[in-house]
């Protein structure tokens, strides 16, 4: 039998694409704007995956509603925006520490799959999501946070560079993607749209490797 040579991939693996970081889209819905005082109410995350050609695509979404942590506040106006009904019988909210474990478990599994060292949060106004995530980690004394504590990929910046748009709805549409305003302000929907936006931009502008 003739030996058949295997052509190596021409793209870097995920473990090298972002310096060992796995991009993970996170979107949170909250009881206000102050992460030190307002409650985390809903969180969704989507690890970014890579196909055999090096193109990025959104992985599976994981989400949960969150029981407001003791001592945190909720601005009623925030509930008007998100449409969250705290006592809805089908909300099935988890306590904050269990919610974090629920979200972080698939992140760690995807990191292992791609041999990445840490996760890096991708978000639209990403530091808002990261600050609420870090506040929850601190409140619960969670010890296995896979995310970098301060570095992010912000799709506001990326979309501004790529399309001249910074509002999520407008950026998504400028990228040629669908947007339904009625579904916005759900952590799952916003995370899905942010993930597709990030992948569209990243796949459109190929990696330039310094020679």
From Swiss-Prot:
Cofactor: binding details: Binds two Mg(2+) per subunit. The active form of the enzyme binds two Mg(2+) ions in its active site. The first Mg(2+) forms only one salt bridge with the protein.
GO molecular function: 3'-5' exonuclease activity; magnesium ion binding; nucleic acid binding; RNA exonuclease activity, producing 5'-phosphomonoesters
Active-site residues from the entry: 185
GO biological process, one term: DNA replication proofreading
Keyword Metal-binding set for record: yes
Enzyme class at the top of the EC tree: hydrolase
Pfam family, one: RNase_T
General function of this protein: Trims short 3' overhangs of a variety of RNA species, leaving a one or two nucleotide 3' overhang. Responsible for the end-turnover of tRNA: specifically removes the terminal AMP residue from uncharged tRNA (tRNA-C-C-A). Also appears to be involved in tRNA biosynthesis.
Name of the molecule in the record: Ribonuclease T
Organism the protein comes from: Xylella fastidiosa (strain 9a5c)
């Amino acid at each position: 039998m003739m030996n058949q040579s295997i052509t190596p991939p021409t793209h870097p693996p995920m473990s090298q694409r972002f310096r060992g970081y796995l991009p993970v889209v996170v979107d949170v819905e909250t009881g206000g704007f102050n992460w030190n005082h307002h409650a985390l109410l809903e969180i969704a995350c989507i690890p970014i995956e890579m196909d055999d050609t090096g193109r990025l695509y959104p992985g599976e979404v994981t989400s949960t509603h969150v029981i407001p942590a003791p001592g945190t506040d909720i601005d009623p106006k925030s509930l008007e925006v998100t449409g969250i009904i705290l006592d809805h019988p089908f909300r099935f909210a988890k306590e904050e520490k269990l919610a974090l474990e629920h979200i972080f478990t698939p992140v760690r599994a995807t990191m292992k799959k791609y041999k990445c060292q840490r996760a890096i949060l991708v978000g639209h106004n990403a530091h808002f999501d990261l600050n609420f995530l870090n506040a929850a980690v601190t409140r619960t004394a969670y010890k296995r946070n896979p995310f970098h504590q301060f570095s992010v990929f912000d799709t506001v910046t990326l979309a501004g560079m790529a399309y001249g748009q910074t509002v999520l709805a407008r950026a998504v549409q400028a990228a040629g993607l669908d947007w339904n305003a009625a579904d916005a302000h759900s952590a799952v929907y916003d995370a899905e749209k942010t993930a597709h936006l990030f992948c569209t931009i990243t796949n459109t502008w190929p990696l330039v490797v310094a020679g």
